[in-house]
């Protein structure tokens, strides 16, 4: 919104220091985006055109005799609207207009001693085409008086950015209220007009569901010529039009904040009614003819009569916004500027707008009418401690009361003798944004100053609000992303499958009483008990489509024989690990341990143990149980060659894991050694039926000092019942670099345990 300092002086005496005023307004939350001086140049004075004669050598030029007080100057002018008896701004010799210095000159053979100026040439917004015509609205016109001695020509124009909740400041009066409250200067109210109304000229009726409040003045003997001071105010705000009545209406709305309208009348008495139209929008009807939609669209009045009906209206901004949102007719004509003001909250004191407009029209008021409507007071009660808690700053009771009273609030102490004291505050009806105690605290903070708040660290104790379902979801999403990073493609299958195929591959099936009673098809006649069957089908489809390297991942529900649901993860690889490309011209095939390593990158480290029972799908020598946290969580295996041949697949491997048995690693800090580690490789002769997992567990349980890790390296046949197992012992300390004696001591203790537990000995 734009307004001038001269506009503000209508309601309040503004301080002389304009820069300080802009700074203070911004502190109050009314951010001043720009402050532009609008001051007429020096040596531009008030003149009066005495005579106008055509130029003898130019059709479009006129030779004017202009009285500037001390003398009469001959000035050549090219404006079409120049005429005798006009008061005009005259730039004398030496005046700087823009970048041009005015001097005596000769135009087409005729001397010219000055320049008659337009508003643009003076540095003001455009008022009209041609020269600027002065009138008494800017002050008493004295010939020869400097133009910048008149207030409208010596001012500053402020552009103020408002937040949507401050509709009360979308007017000159609203900004003046803030200045009055901050500087403790009196506010000049809009004067009420004294008149004796006639009766019977207007009949006003309003429907039962009408929420808007409307007030009317019937006037006559009005003056509809827009004076210069109004033109300047509207031009500064980019609201000046060629319609004089619209200019007066816009000027009154801009100054008072009341939504104004006017109707031209041909006859009186009249039947005035307010009711909902076909779009359920409140509208005004005169003699049963629709004339406007309240707060949304006003008709432009062109053919003006002697009598005018002035209208002031107020609509609750929330109610209006809801109606606009629910409006089904998207083609309805709307006035966006009108909606902008109405939806942010206009001034509900309708008499302010009517009195202001009538006074500037210099009209005679014949009658007044208004709808029955009363705004409910918004009362808030609070303790001083509440304000202190919100702001973190203790403000004296007297200061709080003073700030709120200056802003138009009614403040009283409820139960003065009670402790703590309770304040009761009634918000003014034009403050639509005041609804809670936090809003009251914000008003106090605006005037106390946010810079005066004491910075304090926030004291906050955060409790862990963990959602186990979300944590589970994120865990499996992370597993999926890891699988994708390892080259697996996610697949999804139905939970239904063929019972016969599952039995053929050696998977359990549902007990007969628990089978599906009405299967979709014979191919989907049971609930799946494994993800592997679907993965095999997907692998075959991809092979038939020409893919030679297939890696699939699936998470889904399976069911045991008791029809209990279990969440599992399935992995399947088929074909080549690396496609045919240099240096692997024939590609690189998968092997059991490469696949196991790939799965471990997804689910974490695990160990393997030999399967005790075999199924038709598993290779008898390349299958194992997956152990994690000393618990069996799944199976990993190469698919039996017979199954590969029957299904016409590439050589394939699979892993199926119980999803909820997977370990979820916590973020734990573990120390690491900054000292070098020592490595000792040992080849042990042990019984061929001894599992490495047993060896590892025995050494771990013994807690041999400095022995941090034992790894299997190689295995080969030694004799009928024994094998040679090569293992690596990693030895290091967190405290120091170990010497040979300490390293050998750890190795010797390990050998003693292995000999005792497994009858193992070093190979000679």
Curated annotation (Swiss-Prot):
Residues 38-148 form the tRNA-binding domain. Residues 375-455 form the B5 domain. Its cofactor is Mg(2+). GO terms for biological process: phenylalanyl-tRNA aminoacylation. It comes from the Bacteria. GO terms for cellular component: phenylalanine-tRNA ligase complex. NCBIfam families: pheT_bact, YtpR. Belongs to the phenylalanyl-tRNA synthetase beta subunit family. Type 1 subfamily. Tetramer of two alpha and two beta subunits. This is Phenylalanine--tRNA ligase beta subunit. It comes from Helicobacter pylori (strain ATCC 700392 / 26695) (Campylobacter pylori).
